[in-house]
Amino acid sequence: MAITGIFFGSDTGNTENIAKMIQKQLGKDVADVHDIAKSSKEDLEAYDILLLGIPTWYYGEAQCDWDDFFPTLEEIDFNGKLVALFGCGDQEDYAEYFCDALGTIRDIIEPRGATIVGHWPTAGYHFEASKGLADDDHFVGLAIDEDRQPELTAERVEKWVKQISEELHLDEILNA
């Protein structure tokens, strides 16, 4: 088993593709990928480092598999767990709800002890509001828009993975 668990929910395949891009950059020896629809509480509890991928649907709704998993997520003690979030949204058609699900999942795991890393700058995005903000200048995790800015996805993922690798001290952990 790898040291990092990447858990995603996806209806269109976009968030799944992002999860696999992240795994490819980290390496399969560092990160395992899991579909949240096929995951259990014990699956998440097995990792001290979690990357959670959650897309936002329509008017700020979480993807259905994550929505179904939220009661289970609320049972997990996240103390001692390092968590980075990533998610897909549409900043044009749903500008008032862009990547809201990032905030939804943060609001579940942070009070349960999760240490969240991987805040991502809002520069370069064009949206009106988001519950997925950490502050005025940062999302709580990586925000991806495959509908309006697919040409930026690979670069954003690459930079974010480098950022979280440093924040998580992955080199030190792997070389310990």
Curated annotation (Swiss-Prot):
Pfam families the UniProt entry points to: Flavodoxin_1
PANTHER family, A to Z: FLAVODOXIN 1 (PTHR42809:SF1), FLAVODOXIN 2 (PTHR42809)
Co-factor binding comment: Binds 1 FMN non-covalently.
Domain notes: The structure is significantly stabilized upon cofactor binding.
Top-level taxonomic group: Bacteria
Membrane spanning residue stretches: none
Residues holding FMN: 10-15, 56-60, 90, 94-99, 147
GO molecular function: electron transfer activity; FMN binding
Cofactors named for this entry: FMN
Primary role: Low-potential electron donor to a number of redox enzymes (Potential). Involved in the reactivation of inactive cob(II)alamin in methionine synthase.
GO cellular component, one term: cytoplasm
GN (gene name): fldA
S-S bridge residues: none
Name listed for the protein in its UniProt record: Flavodoxin 1
Subunit: Monomer.
Keyword rRNA processing in record: no
The Flavodoxin-like domain, residue ranges: 4-165
InterPro entries: Flavodoxin, Flavodoxin/NO_synth, Flavodoxin_CS, Flavodoxin_lc, Flavoprotein-like_sf
Keywords assigned: Electron transport, Flavoprotein, FMN, Nucleotide-binding, Transport
Signal peptide span: none
Family: Belongs to the flavodoxin family.
